[in-house]
Amino acid sequence: MSTPALLVLADGSVFHGTSIGYEGSTSGEVVFNTSMTGYQEILTDPSYCKQIVTLTYPHIGNTGTNAEDEESRSVYAAGLIIRDLPLLHSNFRASESLHDYLVRNKTVAIADIDTRRLTTLLREKGAQGGAILTGADATIEKAQELIAAFGSMVGKDLAKEVSCTETYEWTEGEWALGKGFVTPDEQPYHVVAYDFGVKTNILRMLASRGCRLTVVPAQTSAEDVLALNPDGVFLSNGPGDPEPCTYAIKAVQKLIESGKPIFGICLGHQLISLAIGAKTLKMRFSHHGANHPVQDLDSGKVVITSQNHGFAVDADTLPANARITHKSLFDNTLQGIELTDKPVFCFQGHPEASPGPQDVGYLFDKFIGNMKAAKRA
């Protein structure tokens, strides 16, 4: 691995390093993630579509990769930036090195750069466009052309790009040491899950709590969902700007009116907010990491959460029937809401983690409780 690589940012910053993945070029929004582990889950999180991820922890790749840690069917991150790739990897579950994994998935990546300097730039100036090019003929001029062609994340409807194209069933539960992924004996709740870029651990955590899932494409109508007679509806995470997803906003409005229990995560949270008349905005400093403190305003407790979003809901635009349930202790941005007149609630972060803590896993239990109450009514 001695092929030179070049990273260029929209502000003109240039970093020279070494290619550690697929040979070629890529562009996207450059962000940083503070997670110390879980690089494979990050790479395969569809929410990172069109984003080049900088990992702030210096040594990445120590534990290799394996088939069980995939959060989707492929790598969705546009590229990877790290400080150091160890020569050796070691883990009892490892089946492949990170380098080989990146090459097989045609993911462009760069190492041997000062990620502390890069993170400081992104922290001070905010996420911005960037490009990685590999090979001796990589030039700053080519990188600038790629950055200009990419533009920004504003206005990009990426949910349609990462969503499944056909409806499928899911029953597999969470992973257990020595057992692998376990399917519960009983799954009394039927949940229709919208795939806007859903992570598999979300599906597994719902399945482990007794949910039989029907996963539907992003553009599925509310009428088609209600025809399946679900006990509840789940709105998944996903990439891009929520405002262009007018097809989803329209469907969510009708689903809310139906009175079905609804739970949304990440993009799903933003779509619920837009459906009830609130506004979203592009964050200058996006949230990406597994150590974000959030306050549960109902209990007063502080929970450590996994976060991955570049857009947020404007709390000042919420209607009267939406109450705020969670807020970020980093920047006070809105993290969760609940409707006072419908069994609908949502959370901006990732209760399923992967990677990260599961301090807010109780939100899955809340969803189960809402469905149980609805079945008794």
Swiss-Prot record:
One Pfam family from the record: GATase
TM spans (from-to): none
EC number of this enzyme: 6.3.5.5
Region (CPSase), start-end ranges: 1-186
Domain Glutamine amidotransferase type-1 residue range list: 190-377
Reactions the enzyme catalyzes: hydrogencarbonate + L-glutamine + 2 ATP + H2O = carbamoyl phosphate + L-glutamate + 2 ADP + phosphate + 2 H(+)
UniProt cross-references to PROSITE patterns, sorted A to Z: GATASE_TYPE_1
Similarity annotation: Belongs to the CarA family.
Assembly and binders: Composed of two chains; the small (or glutamine) chain promotes the hydrolysis of glutamine to ammonia, which is used by the large (or ammonia) chain to synthesize carbamoyl phosphate. Tetramer of heterodimers (alpha,beta)4.
Name under which the protein is recorded: Carbamoyl phosphate synthase small chain
Record organism: Neisseria meningitidis serogroup B (strain ATCC BAA-335 / MC58)
Lineage start: Bacteria, Pseudomonadati, Pseudomonadota, Betaproteobacteria, Neisseriales
